[in-house]
Amino acid sequence: GFVIAYAYDPRWRTTLNLKGFFVRRLVRLHPMVLLSAVIGAVTFSIQGGVQWNGTQVSTSALMLALLCTMFFIPAVPGSYAEVRGNGEMFPLNGPSWSLFFEYIGNIIYALVLRRLSNKVLTIVVVLLGAGLSLFAIADAASYTSIGVGWTLDGVNFGGGLLRMLFPFSMGMLLSRQFKPMKISGAFWKCTLMLVALMAVPYIPACAGVHLNGVYEMACVIIVFPLIVKMGASAGNSNKLYHFLGGISYPLYIIHYPVMYLFYAWLIDEKRYTLAETWHVVVPMYVALVVAAHLLLKYYDEPIRRYLSRKWVK
């Protein structure tokens, strides 16, 4: 939300229209969606083993799942296209569900949110924050967390919309009211904050209160916006920041097809600790980072430049 509002809000008053906005977003995001779908189909088709044996799935089902993933048509749990059997919207590349909601967020932004005054947007943010907090603290999905949105049922779709709409709207509001703060070493401070937040283990419920939901909402409502503001206030950049920023999207969209193979290997080998798996984890981590960088430089950026020349006015 912060990035979209920062990049596009001023343009609506001058050169940007709805068609131009949607074309720009598709050019930015969808080339890697298409490639990741193919990678997911290939890794699934070669994956044998006890868990998610893709070698036994018919070619027609795999092709249907591939087309659905490429064109962001979510699979209904138990349907022919839901080939992995986990109930995922996009069984060839599970995390695509979050990008699916981001696409919805872009549509809502272009049609509605960008037109709202700061006062109305603030009211929207408060209401969405209250709704997401209630969802999390009441454990509406019975997941003991707000890890919803990945499958196409009522609770997950509604929860996924809340998970996207609140931070998206909050990010827009932060962008509109942004005033840089004085901070040094913002990158490292933000990194340490994120590591500390993610290192907190699951917090069990107490006296009927889902404390894990309370913690998650404290992060989402207070800490994450602060981290965004700190990062945006940094005001400087270097090669490391550019490298990490560049690979972030390719790494996000390609890593999970490989993780499926890794999970299946863990289950087959019955290896569950880092001491038993580090010799696979470390090379896989390095390989994914290198692959993300190579795909950025030799696939994503060239295709986006080509499509921008043809379609973006």
Where are the regions a protein language model picked out?
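Transmembrane alpha-helical segments and their boundary/interface "anchor" motifs
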Residues: 9-50, 56-72, 105-106, 159, ...
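Membrane-interface helix-boundary motifs at transmembrane edges
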Residues: 13-19, 52-53, 112-121, 175-187, ...
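Specific transmembrane alpha-helix
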Residues: 1-9, 98-114, 128-184, 215-236, ...
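Alpha-helical transmembrane segments of multi-pass integral membrane proteins
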Residues: 131-134, 168, 193-301
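Hydrophobic alpha-helical transmembrane segments
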Residues: 22, 30, 121-126, 191, ...
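Transmembrane helix-loop junctions in multipass membrane proteins, especially transporters and channels
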Residues: 10-15, 45-53, 114, 118-121, ...
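Membrane-interface helix-loop-helix regions
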Residues: 29-103, 131-149, 154, 215-228
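Helix-boundary and loop/linker segments of multi-pass membrane transporters
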Residues: 13, 58, 82-85, 157, ...
